[in-house]
Amino acid sequence: ASRDVIRKIREEVFIKEQHVPPELEWDSHDIEAVHFLALEGRNPVGCARLMPSGKFGRMAVLREHRSHNWGSRLINAIEDYARHELKIREIRAAAQAHAIPFYQKNGFNVEAGFFDDAGIAHLNVYKAPGAPETNYVFNPGRDSNLYSLDDVTSLVGWTEMMLAMRPRRAIIACSDLHHPLWWNHAALDAVRRFAAGSHRRRVKILIPSEMGGINRHPLLRLQQRLSSRISVRVSAEVRDDVLITGPWGLLELTSEMHGIATMGDASRVKKMEALYLPLTETGQRPKEARRLAL
């Protein structure tokens, strides 16, 4: 019976919500894994599985219960079982990029290197059960590395991860409106989640000029849906393609498949903010956007 309940949770979260193909969701590892089921009273709210090797995954919490700390409770249960029953020294997982702040909060270390799993950007995370975080990879303000991102998965993963870290604001300077990042559903959803997550958050989008049909661009359509949180301005001074997530995050897009990123160079981020933030105030609203607002 518990297996059926777990199956329903995974179907709801992974297959229906995240659009993971069913043939990728179900595998032979389910037979050998230890399965965890989180209950609120008698109501199932989440699940996870742990392999004998110490790798865990398929961790899911139903949408309506995600602000109730069930993810951390599942992690604690996995750690306890791995430590006392399996007697293993390390647990590992392939974490979705947007969930990295959650794993860091729970003491996990992150391995640099984004990869695709079922069409979703992931990173490997690991932890010695009961031990604190021991490295600063992808830790805002502490990680001084400069990262070269060499494919769309990495560019999207960085965008998802950085916006999930709740920066004070996000500035998107978009000199090339055809760049694949800003047509990617996962990247756009990360922008939407960030903007919708708090009434204090703001996304400021800058474009160099207007073009016919600009209101059909995904960024403009997103702005129309969240006009109180997202603004678009036109300025001929926009010559770069960057995502600034102050006070510590910066992604500079150098081509369609490449970008340079940092989350520890505060002076560089401050310089880029000083360059682009005034343009978000002095730039003009797109004419098509003004017509739509009438």
Q: Model-found features: residue ranges?
A:
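Conserved beta-strand in the GNAT
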Residues: 37, 42-60
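Conserved GNAT acetyl-CoA-binding A-motif
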Residues: 82-96
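PLD-like (HKD) phosphodiesterase/transphosphatidyltransferase domain
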Residues: 134-205
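HKD (HxKxxxxD) catalytic microenvironment of the phospholipase D
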Residues: 231-276
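A short, internal acetyl-CoA/4′-phosphopantetheine-binding micro-motif in the GNAT/acyltransferase core
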Residues: 59-67
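Conserved acetyl-CoA-binding loop-helix of GNAT-fold acetyltransferases
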Residues: 67-80
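Conserved catalytic-core motifs of GNAT/GCN5-like acyltransferases
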Residues: 94, 104, 109-124
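Short amphipathic alpha-helix that is part of the acyltransferase structural core
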Residues: 1-25, 35, 40-43
